[in-house]
């Protein structure tokens, strides 16, 4: 019994040293296990085109679909960035999309990232000039522009906008947390480290 306890303690110490070594030489390795990064080339390509942080797009994709391209929500949102077909039609019209069928095309990972990135850039531009513009863009991505516009109109000048939906407040906080994790784990691959 005593030998087994000593062996267990030695094994735990060796495991702890191994963990510390890997954590020191490969920072963020544990984050990469929990939070994968797929479609890196599409993410990096479109964020440069739309002037966004690649960690932000990776975080939104993770939060929306966990990088599952064939994801479909109960509300009808489709693909990696969970775009509604009606939203995607509007994006297609603004970006020159032709012969666009949202019921099928939104499952294409590259197109979904392109449209989702464009939409997020559009929302950031729409709310630019406000100190909480980044949060408002994420809130609008999650809850819709009409809700955010209403919240803004109900907010006294100079005050931060109060997001009325708890799920949307959680969404914004979760995306911010994920952005920091993706920067830590993949900053070198995303160019945002």
Predicted feature locations:
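Catalytic glycan-binding domains that act on GlcNAc-containing polysaccharides
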Residues: 19-193
């Amino acid at each position: 019994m005593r030998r087994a306890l000593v062996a267990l303690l030695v094994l735990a110490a060796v495991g702890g040293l191994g963990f510390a070594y890997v954590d020191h030489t490969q920072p963020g390795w544990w984050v990469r296990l929990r939070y994968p990064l797929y479609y890196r080339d599409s993410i990096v390509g479109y964020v440069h085109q739309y002037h966004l942080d690649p960690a932000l797009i990776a975080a939104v994709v993770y939060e929306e679909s966990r990088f599952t391209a064939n994801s479909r929500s109960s509300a009808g949102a489709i693909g990696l960035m969970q775009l509604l077909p009606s939203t995607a039609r509007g994006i297609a019209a603004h970006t020159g999309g032709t012969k666009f069928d949202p019921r099928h095309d939104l499952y294409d990972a590259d197109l979904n990232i392109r449209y989702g990135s464009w939409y997020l850039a559009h929302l950031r531009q729409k709310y630019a000039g406000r100190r909480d513009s980044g949060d408002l863009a994420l809130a609008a991505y999650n809850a819709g522009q009409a809700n955010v516009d209403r919240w803004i109109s109900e907010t006294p000048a100079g005050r931060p906008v109060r997001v009325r939906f708890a799920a949307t407040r959680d969404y914004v906080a979760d995306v911010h947390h994920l952005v920091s994790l993706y920067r830590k784990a993949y900053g070198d691959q995303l160019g945002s480290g």
